[in-house]
C-alpha cells in the first residue's frame, strides 16, 4: 500500500467520515480516530472545530488541493453572482482532475490527478496536464490512445453507469466524456454530508 493510500485512509478516520466512499477504507471497520487511544478518546469539539472539520473534509475529498487553491476558489465564488456555496462547489467540480474522477476514468481523485499530470488526458483534442484547469460547459475530455488499455483505466471505466453524475456524460466505447453543465450541490455524489455552509461561515470570519 502506498504512502498516499495509507495517509488518505488515516484522514477518513481522523475526520470521522469515509471521504471517498471506498470499500477498502479503514474507516468502514475502524470508525474512530487513529492512534493508541483513538477508540476511547473523548473529544469535545468547539464551534470553530466543527467549522474547521467541515472544511477539512471537503478539502480532503478533492485530493491534493492546497489550502491556498481552496481559499482562492472561495474568494472567486464570493465574487460571482448567486449563492456563494453553490458557486464554490461548481468551481471545485469543474477542475479537470475532479471531472476525470467523476467520469470514472480513474478509481480515485489521486489517480485522476496523476493521469492528468502525466499528460494522459486530452481536453478538446489537446493535451491537458494541469489538474486545476477549469472546464466550461460543452468541453470534451478524452483518454490518449496510447494509454486506453492500461488496466487501471479499463477497470475504472467498467463501472460506468453506476455513479457517473448527471452533469457529465461518458461514452465507454470511445472513452470520451463531456462536461454538460455546472452542478448544484445536490447533484454531487459526496459519500458524506458536505456541510458547505460551515465552510463558507469559516472563511467569512
UniProtKB/Swiss-Prot annotation:
Leader sequence residues: none
BP GO annotations: ribosomal small subunit biogenesis; translation
InterPro entries: Ribosomal_uS4, Ribosomal_uS4_bac-type, Ribosomal_uS4_CS, Ribosomal_uS4_N, S4_RNA-bd, S4_RNA-bd_sf
S4 RNA-binding domain span: 94-157
The keyword Lipid metabolism belongs to this UniProt entry's keyword annotation: no
PROSITE patterns, per database record: RIBOSOMAL_S4, S4
Keyword Ribonucleoprotein: yes
Classification via Pfam families: Ribosomal_S4, S4
Keywords: Ribonucleoprotein, Ribosomal protein, RNA-binding, rRNA-binding
A GO term, aspect molecular function: rRNA binding
One Gene Ontology cellular component annotation held by this UniProt entry: small ribosomal subunit
Subunit structure of this chain's protein: Part of the 30S ribosomal subunit. Contacts protein S5. The interaction surface between S4 and S5 is involved in control of translational fidelity.
Family per similarity comment: Belongs to the universal ribosomal protein uS4 family.
Cross-referenced HAMAP family: Ribosomal_uS4_B
Protein purpose: One of the primary rRNA binding proteins, it binds directly to 16S rRNA where it nucleates assembly of the body of the 30S subunit.
Protein's UniProt name: Small ribosomal subunit protein uS4
Organism: Rickettsia akari (strain Hartford)
Amino acid at each position: 500500500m502506498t504512502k498516499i493510500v495509507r495517509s488518505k485512509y488515516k484522514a477518513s478516520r481522523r475526520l470521522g467520515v469515509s471521504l471517498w466512499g471506498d470499500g477498502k477504507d479503514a474507516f468502514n471497520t475502524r470508525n474512530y480516530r487513529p492512534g493508541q487511544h483513538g477508540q476511547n478518546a473523548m473529544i469535545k469539539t468547539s464551534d470553530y472545530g466543527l467549522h474547521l472539520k467541515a472544511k477539512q473534509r471537503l478539502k480532503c475529498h478533492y485530493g491534493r488541493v492546497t489550502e491556498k487553491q481552496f481559499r482562492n476558489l472561495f474568494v472567486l465564488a464570493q465574487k460571482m453572482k448567486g449563492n456563494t456555496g453553490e458557486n464554490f462547489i461548481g468551481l471545485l467540480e469543474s477542475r479537470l482532475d475532479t471531472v476525470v474522477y467523476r467520469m470514472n476514468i480513474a478509481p480515485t481523485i489521486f489517480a485522476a490527478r496523476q493521469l492528468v499530470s502525466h499528460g494522459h488526458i486530452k481536453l478538446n483534442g489537446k493535451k491537458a496536464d494541469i489538474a486545476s484547469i477549469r472546464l466550461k460547459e460543452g468541453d470534451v475530455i478524452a483518454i490518449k490512445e496510447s494509454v486506453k488499455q492500461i488496466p487501471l483505466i479499463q477497470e475504472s471505466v467498467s463501472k460506468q453507469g453506476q455513479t457517473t453524475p448527471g452533469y457529465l456524460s461518458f461514452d465507454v466505447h470511445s472513452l470520451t466524456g463531456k462536461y454538460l453543465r455546472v452542478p448544484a450541490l445536490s447533484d454531487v455524489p459526496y459519500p458524506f454530508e458536505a456541510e458547505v455552509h460551515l465552510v463558507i461561515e469559516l472563511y467569512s470570519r
